[in-house]
Design a protein with these regions (language model features):
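Bacterial N-terminal signal peptides that target proteins for export
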Residues: 1-6
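Bacterial signal peptide processing site
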Residues: 17-19
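C-terminal motif of bacterial Sec signal peptides marking the signal peptidase cleavage site
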Residues: 12-15
Length: 251
């Protein structure tokens, strides 16, 4: 009887005692910018420089293009982005501002240097961007974003309802051949934007590396595009990466 009473007392004390604490999700590691794991997946490491050639086998000197990931920048509304500067002979041709939400990659703004023109993807007054990729993207996927594209010129701006569609497919063997190496697999990204605001017709993405092929007119209006294949990847300012500006590196 005494044993039964003691057992009942212990049970009641455990039932009424403090509940075990649970640790809230701390969110992504932002020590390297926005989301360290996602940045590594997409190749958006701050100060990383991708240099490209017009050839799939021979490096160019100087490179045909440099894509330089810059430190986190805050746009209006407090939206934090990673700017990527596209440079030719050291001069900026275009800037893409990317953000990462829930591991997904979004293009928020594209600026066309020397023209005063840019396009920003918004929902109402909020800078929301258009989706490019997810952490586990594979072939045969489509990401559709219905949004407003705000096109700014030097003295004016206009907002247009826009459908932005990113479709993924397996990259071909020829698209995966670069002066740097021949990759075994990757995703071809095909953009359909209606109406178009200077979107890239094609890119090739290799997970945990980045964009190994870029085809872009680097202008708001459609123009000639030449596919450019990666010839070198370096971290500017590091002992191995050198101090030369992106697009000025030695092959």
């Amino acid at each position: 009887m005494r044993l039964a009473a003691l057992s009942l007392f212990v049970f009641s004390m455990s039932a009424c005692g403090p509940k075990p604490t649970t640790t809230a999700d701390a969110g992504p590691d932002t020590s390297c910018g926005l989301d360290c794991a996602a940045q590594a997946r997409y190749g958006l490491i701050v100060e990383r420089c991708f240099e490209y050639s017009e050839s799939t086998s021979t490096p160019q000197d100087p490179p045909a293009l440099g894509a330089w990931v810059r430190p986190v920048f805050t746009l209006e509304g407090g939206v934090k982005v990673l700017p990527v500067e596209y440079r030719v002979n050291g001069q900026i041709k275009m800037i893409d501002s990317f953000t990462i939400r829930d591991g997904n990659l979004y293009l928020v703004r594209r600026e066309f240097s020397g023209t005063g023109q840019s396009v920003t993807y918004k929902t109402g007054m909020d800078l929301t961007g258009v989706q490019w990729l997810a952490m586990e993207s594979g072939p045969g996927e489509t990401y559709t974003t219905n949004t407003d594209a705000f096109v700014a010129n030097t003295s004016s701006g206009v907002s247009t309802p826009t459908t932005y569609r990113m479709t993924t497919a397996d990259a071909s063997a020829s698209e995966l051949k670069t002066p740097l190496t021949t990759y075994t697999s990757g995703l071809k990204l095909l953009v359909g934007e209606t109406p178009d605001h200077g979107s890239d017709p094609r890119r090739v993405f290799v997970p945990d590396v980045g964009f190994v092929l870029i085809a872009s007119s680097f202008s708001l209006l459609p123009g000639t595009t030449v596919p450019l294949s990666v010839q070198k990847i370096r971290d500017i300012g590091s002992p191995d990466g050198g101090s030369e500006g992106c697009s000025l590196g030695v092959p």
